Regions:
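Catalytic cores of peptidoglycan-degrading enzymes
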Residues: 22-149
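Non-catalytic extracellular/periplasmic "stalk"
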Residues: 1-27
């Protein structure tokens, strides 16, 4: 028979799992300019390019939000992605954000869903102001639109 403490412990666990699920759109509004999956290379270097996330165009300097609570695993410059943040959310979930103009977090920092982690930019391999947003489940990229609406 479950005790009150058992039930409270289970409720805390469920709330932690819910907070780890990347369901928050990472910008206020914006327009998807490139979807997850195969696409033409936007720079014309190849006829086919695999795109592991979605690109969300927005105003330069608009805030970028953590899609779920977690720990900043990486924050800095990454080739191609420019100013980049990767968040470990637990339960197999990670998110990554690229091309930002400025970062607002550091590696090792804890963030809550909705915290500002950076600002929309065009750093790295980019054609204009946007944030590249990736969701990984157990290390595999997945279409962010399956979780975030």
């Amino acid at each position: 028979k479950a005790t009150l403490n058992d039930l409270l412990s289970r409720l805390r666990e469920l709330n932690q799992r819910k907070a780890a699920l990347p369901t928050l759109w990472p910008t206020n509004g914006g327009t998807i300019t490139s979807y997850f999956g195969g696409r033409s290379d936007p720079f014309g270097n190849r006829s086919y390019d695999w795109h592991p996330g979605v690109d969300i165009a927005n105003d330069y300097g608009a805030p970028v939000y953590a899609s779920a609570s977690g720990t900043i695993e990486e924050a800095g410059w990454v080739s191609g992605y420019g100013r980049y943040v990767r968040i470990q959310h637990g339960y197999g979930y990670e998110t990554a954000y690229g091309h930002m103009s400025k970062l607002a977090v550091q590696a090792g920092q804890s963030v809550s869903k909705g915290d500002v982690i950076g600002y929309v930019g065009s750093s790295g391999y980019s054609t204009g102001p946007h944030v590249h947003f990736e969701v990984l489940v157990n290390g595999q990229t997945t279409d962010p639109l399956e979780l975030v609406r």
